[in-house]
């Protein structure tokens, strides 16, 4: 079996006296779509933010595509490893976080130009293709303020893909959208999942998406992965009463 593209070992995260993550261990294979779900406060978003070190773990080790970083005091070498790890991860947030003063195409091109130091012609061609992939090529020269929430989130997905990450992290990407706009973002994510080109870790309460797209589901409870399995396993016969109670409440 090939090495996992994401490996998390003994991950702990505390904020003061509050322990939010209590020892997470998980391996995720290339091309896998892992849906993380659970009640508010169970540690889902903190888990994602620790993977790309937007939150610094209190304890544990994280490996993404061969770049391994352990918890500890910041050092020059560790900061370098974190920068390398982040180039392998793209992240889509609840809020779109697009640069309001930049056109859509410039938002998508920014990281490959500034961080990746790639040639402008190549970056522009790739960015236009990414916008076409998410159905936004006709809005390339618009500014974010002129877009709907669903359109902005689709641009945010294209922007995250522009650095050609090996892992995409989605932190409740539809939670800030009006109900009628959710489907357009989920459709883009489904096409990305169907391509099997990118590993996806998705925090969401959209159980229809999970049932259709996920290769694995992980139920977070009280800072731990209480149960994991295929959608068929968890929807039809969850082993934990907590998992069953949660699914009964949201389905």
Where are these regions (language model features)?
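ABC family nucleotide-binding domain
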Residues: 4-231
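C-terminal boundary and immediately downstream tail of ABC-type ATPase nucleotide-binding domains
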Residues: 220-221, 228-251
């Amino acid at each position: 079996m090939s090495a996992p593209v994401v490996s998390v070992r003994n991950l702990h995260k505390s904020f003061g006296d509050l322990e939010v993550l209590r020892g997470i261990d998980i391996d995720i294979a290339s091309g896998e779509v892992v849906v993380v779900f659970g009640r508010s406060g169970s540690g889902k978003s903190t888990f994602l933010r620790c993977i790309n070190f937007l939150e610094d773990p209190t304890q544990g080790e994280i490996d993404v595509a061969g770049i391994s970083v352990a918890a500890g005091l910041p050092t020059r070498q560790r900061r370098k490893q974190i920068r390398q790890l982040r180039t392998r991860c793209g992240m889509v947030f609840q809020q779109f976080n697009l640069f309001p003063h930049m056109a859509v195409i410039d938002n998508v091109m920014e990281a490959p130009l500034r961080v990746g130091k790639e040639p402008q012609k190549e970056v522009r061609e790739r960015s236009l293709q990414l916008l076409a992939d998410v159905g936004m090529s006709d809005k390339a020269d618009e500014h974010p303020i002129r877009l709907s929430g669903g359109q902005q989130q689709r641009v945010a997905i294209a922007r995250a893909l522009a650095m050609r990450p090996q892992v995409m992290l989605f932190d409740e990407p539809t939670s800030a959208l009006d109900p009628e706009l959710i489907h357009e973002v989920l459709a883009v994510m489904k096409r990305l999942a169907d391509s099997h080109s990118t590993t996806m870790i998705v925090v969401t309460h959209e159980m229809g998406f999970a049932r259709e797209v996920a290769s694995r589901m992980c139920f977070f409870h009280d800072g731990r992965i209480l149960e994991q399995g295929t959608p068929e396993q968890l929807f039809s016969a969850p082993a934990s009463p907590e998992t069953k109670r949660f699914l009964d409440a949201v389905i």
